[in-house]
Regions:
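N-terminal binding-site loop/beta-alpha segment at the start of enzyme catalytic domains
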Residues: 1-74, 141
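Conserved, mostly hydrophobic/aromatic
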Residues: 6, 18, 46, 59, ...
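N-terminal small/glycine-rich loop or linker at the start of catalytic domains
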Residues: 7-23, 73-85, 114-117, 213-217
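Short, well-ordered coil/turn segments that N-cap beta-strands
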Residues: 11-16, 42-45, 66-71, 107-111, ...
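Active-site mouth loops of central-metabolism enzymes
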Residues: 16-29, 78-95, 121-125, 220-229
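Short, acidic/polar
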Residues: 25-38, 89-106, 152-160, 230-238
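Active-site groove signature of glycoside hydrolases
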Residues: 100-124
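Beta/alpha (TIM)-barrel catalytic core signal, keyed to glycine-rich beta->alpha loops juxtaposed to Asp/Glu
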Residues: 118-255
């Protein structure tokens, strides 16, 4: 496994990370097996913004005795207390969800605490007004959150938060479709997106890449707008070649 160093820290992050959206639909035993296999293969970076609450107790069991081997990307605004994914900027919801996530992950710290999925100015305004931003900053000051991050699909919001000088990592969608104007989250021109990647690199903000295969669409010639299937390796390398990228988060279904 290859590793890249976090610019604002000394963590060595595996260039291949693991997303949790797909694996979260599996049985608990299969989730545990997949996470442990990923660790054995040298994967050490895991995103926790999946679609199902089941990933949290499963990860908690998978990481027993191995918590130091994993870095978790936990989202302040992703709510799982109802059993499935929900999104909120309300402080009480975020506090309740983070408490629940920590309990089920069986951990007392968060490697990367993310301001979750802010795609519009109104989202950031609500996050600040409701006290959610202060909450995550307070948790960082207390040492519970080690690094701050942001997940977004829009270059505009990414640049807005970069201006605030708060984050060490940004989660952003990078794949050939989005960079060249194809797909739901193809937001911003190719030049705007590349300028963002270069800014992150220049300012020492690492990028963790989501949606590298666009839910498998790029791997299927019949579904791809390019009418040609790419391999998983091609998609991963495409993202890793972009400025600022530390890790690419694929979403395995199971082993």
């Amino acid at each position: 496994m290859e590793y890249r160093e976090l610019p604002h820290g000394d963590e060595a992050i595996s260039v291949i990370g693991m997303g949790s959206s797909v694996v979260g639909a599996q049985k608990e035993a299969d989730i545990i097996k997949t996470v442990r296999h990923a660790l054995d293969c040298g994967v050490n970076y895991f995103d926790m913004a999946g679609g199902h609450a089941a990933i949290f107790p499963a990860y908690g069991k998978a990481l027993e005795g191995r918590r130091k081997d994993a870095m978790l990307q936990v989202h302040f605004g992703a709510d799982y207390t109802g059993g499935e994914y929900g999104w909120s900027t309300k402080l009480d919801v975020i506090k309740r969800s983070i408490e629940w996530q920590l309990k089920n992950l069986k951990t007392d710290y968060i490697d990367f605490g993310f301001i979750h999925c802010l795609d519009e100015q109104g989202d950031l305004a609500a996050y600040e007004k409701n006290g959610a931003l202060k909450f995550i900053l307070d948790m960082q000051a207390q040492g519970v959150v080690r690094h701050l991050g942001l997940s977004t699909h829009t270059p505009e919001m990414a640049n807005c938060v970069l201006d605030m000088k708060l984050i060490d990592v940004m989660m952003f969608s990078i794949n050939p479709m989005y960079d060249y104007g194809q797909g739901e989250f193809a937001i911003g021109s190719a030049n705007e997106r590349m300028d963002l990647y270069r800014r992150c690199e220049a300012e020492g903000v690492g990028i963790s890449v989501m949606k590298p295969f666009n839910a498998g669409q790029l791997l299927d010639a019949k579904k791809s707008p390019f009418h040609q299937a790419l391999t998983t390796t091609q998609c991963i390398q495409y993202a890793l070649d972009k400025p600022g990228v530390l890790t690419v988060l694929g979403g395995p279904g199971s082993m």
